């Protein structure tokens, strides 16, 4: 009877037949992790290039508010072919997928550097370059759990996932720092601007940043081309050596799994809104007279704090297994309170909360620490919940939905740019909604059970 309700792939034994092969880890796993993390870092850096310097970009290239929002929107739009990259990772492995991703980033960064005098054409080239960089997003955001399972032992997986997934966010954070510090604001009265001319100096600095990013991306692409194997000679764990479901079966199983959909919404809504919110943080803080440089520092430290906490929490999860849900509840409680504080600060006339640089810094940094810190824990929980569905497919569906919510938020931003306080309310509401979803979620650790209780 049961055979009628299962596919041929699901009736295959989970473990491959044959003699025992003791799991083993290789030192080269750290090189693979380093190259992938560098690629993820650069993709995040390029994606967030324009939001932190939106005032300078308007002056240098005559970008409109719609252009700035669209430059950020190319990130989630780039996730439209996400399912193609998921199929490629599942069928061709890490090397082919990561190489294609790096090539798209090289082409995108190069397109932004084409020296054209016509500003209308230059704007189109920059938009095209951002779109190509957006197409690299599915791999750098999805592949971290797949890479950690393929190369790392069970007591290192959460740490490897945290490092690989957090570096993309760290790249976005460094854009908050690099852009405002290198590119002068249009209202600057520095000697450089007085000597070189405001518009020309700003444009030269922006182009210098784009040339530097292109050069670094090309070097990383060359390194990946030289050495980036899909898998180690011997699997590092029982889970890495086990069979997985087919692509079609995996998609159907994911979409029919209510527990998975519940925890996916708990991730996709707040993290998607947070990505869109942080991408236009400069616009949000402009009405309260926060300068471009100060907004950059706020964005930088909020994401850096989240990256540090995410990696630390990942290491903690490796040390004490089976506590992913309590960690998420703790982090989202902090995120909900911090986002509420930030939102109410903008209503100081009603709430009488002090609106100062210190309160903005503190509340923004806490939001980033708590929300970004949940990413690697979520990824590990997704994989544990739906195992033996491949990690790349699982996280592909998750990040596609996250970018869908980010795209919806930014789409509304292109339509309504007068008062951006509604963005703060969206972020706060999404944190409380996610907290409810996590509290209702029933956790399981199927992959961990296989590694702990089954020996090859």
UniProtKB/Swiss-Prot annotation:
Reaction(s) catalysed by this chain's protein: pyridoxine(out) + n H(+)(out) = pyridoxine(in) + n H(+)(in)
- Compartments, as annotated in UniProt: Lysosome membrane
Q: How does this chain sit within the bilayer?
A: Multi-pass membrane protein
List, alphabetically, the CDD domains matched: MFS_DIRC2
Glycosylation positions?
62, 187, 349, 419
Which GO BP terms, alphabetically? Answer: pyridoxine transport
Cytoplasmic compartment residues: 1-29, 89-95, 153-162, 229-259, 314-326, 384-392, 442-456
Q: Pinpoint motif Di-leucine motif by residue range.
A: 14-15
**Matching InterPro entries:** FLVCR1-2_SLC49-like, MFS, MFS_trans_sf, SLC49A4-like
- List the ranges whose topology is Lumenal: 51-67, 117-131, 184-207, 281-292, 348-362, 414-420
Q: Which UniProt keywords apply?
A: Glycoprotein, Lysosome, Membrane, Transmembrane, Transmembrane helix, Transport
Q: Where are the transmembrane segments?
A: 30-50, 68-88, 96-116, 132-152, 163-183, 208-228, 260-280, 293-313, 327-347, 363-383, 393-413, 421-441
Q: Does the keyword RNA-binding apply?
A: no
Question: From which residue to which does the signal peptide run?
Answer: none
Entries under Gene3D superfamilies matching the protein: MFS general substrate transporter like domains
User: What GO cellular component entries does it have?
Assistant: lysosomal membrane
A Gene Ontology molecular-function term? Answer: transmembrane transporter activity
Recorded family membership:
Belongs to the major facilitator superfamily.
Q: What does this protein do?
A: Mediates H(+)-dependent pyridoxine transport.
Official protein name in the record? Solute carrier family 49 member 4 homolog
| Species the sequence originates in | Xenopus tropicalis (Western clawed frog)
Q: What is the lineage of its organism?
A: Eukaryota, Metazoa, Chordata, Craniata, Vertebrata
């Amino acid at each position: 009877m049961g055979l009628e309700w299962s596919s041929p792939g699901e009736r295959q034994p989970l473990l491959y037949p044959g003699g025992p092969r003791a799991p083993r880890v290789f030192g080269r796993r750290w090189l693979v992790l380093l190259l992938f993390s560098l690629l993820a870092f650069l993709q995040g850096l390029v994606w967030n290039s324009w939001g932190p310097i939106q005032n300078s970009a308007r002056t240098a290239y005559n970008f409109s508010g719609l252009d700035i929002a669209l430059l950020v929107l190319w990130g989630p739009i780039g996730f439209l072919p996400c399912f193609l990259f998921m199929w490629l990772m599942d069928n061709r492995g890490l090397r082919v997928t990561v190489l294609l991703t790096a090539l798209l980033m090289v082409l995108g960064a190069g397109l932004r550097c084409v020296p054209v005098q016509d500003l209308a054409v230059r704007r189109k080239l920059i938009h095209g370059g951002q779109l190509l960089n957006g197409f690299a997003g599915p791999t750098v955001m999805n592949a971290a759990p797949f890479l950690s399972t393929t190369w790392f032992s069970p007591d290192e997986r959460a740490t490897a996932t945290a490092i690989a997934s957090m570096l993309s966010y760290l790249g976005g954070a460094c854009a908050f720092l690099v852009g405002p510090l290198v590119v002068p604001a249009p209202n600057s009265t520095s000697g450089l601007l007085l000597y070189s001319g405001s518009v020309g100096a700003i444009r030269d600095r922006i182009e210098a940043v784009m040339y530097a990013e292109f050069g670094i991306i090309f070097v990383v692409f060359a390194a990946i081309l030289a050495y980036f194997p899909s898998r180690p000679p011997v699997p590092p764990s029982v889970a890495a050596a086990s069979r997985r479901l087919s692509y079609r079966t995996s998609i159907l199983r994911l979409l029919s799994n209510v527990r998975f959909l519940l925890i996916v919404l708990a991730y996709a809504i707040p993290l998607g809104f947070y990505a869109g919110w942080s991408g236009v943080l400069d616009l949000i803080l402009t009405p309260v007279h926060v300068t471009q440089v100060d907004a950059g520092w706020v964005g930088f430290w909020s994401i850096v704090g989240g990256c540090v906490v995410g990696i630390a929490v990942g290491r903690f999860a490796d040390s004490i297994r089976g506590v992913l849900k309590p960690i998420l509840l703790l982090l989202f409680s902090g995120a909900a309170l911090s986002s509420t504080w930030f939102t109410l600060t903008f209503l100081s006339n009603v709430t009488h909360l002090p609106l100062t640089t210190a309160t903005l810094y503190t509340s923004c940094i806490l939001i980033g620490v708590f929300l970004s810190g949940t990413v690697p824990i979520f990824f590990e929980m997704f994989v544990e919940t739906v195992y033996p569905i491949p990690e790349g497919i699982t996280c592909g569906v998750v990040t596609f939905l996250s970018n869908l919510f980010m795209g919806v938020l930014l789409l509304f931003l292109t339509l309504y740019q007068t008062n951006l306080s509604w963005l703060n309310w969206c972020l706060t509401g999404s944190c409380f909604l996610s907290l409810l979803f996590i509290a209702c979620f029933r956790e399981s650790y199927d992959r961990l059970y296989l590694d702990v209780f089954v020996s090859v």
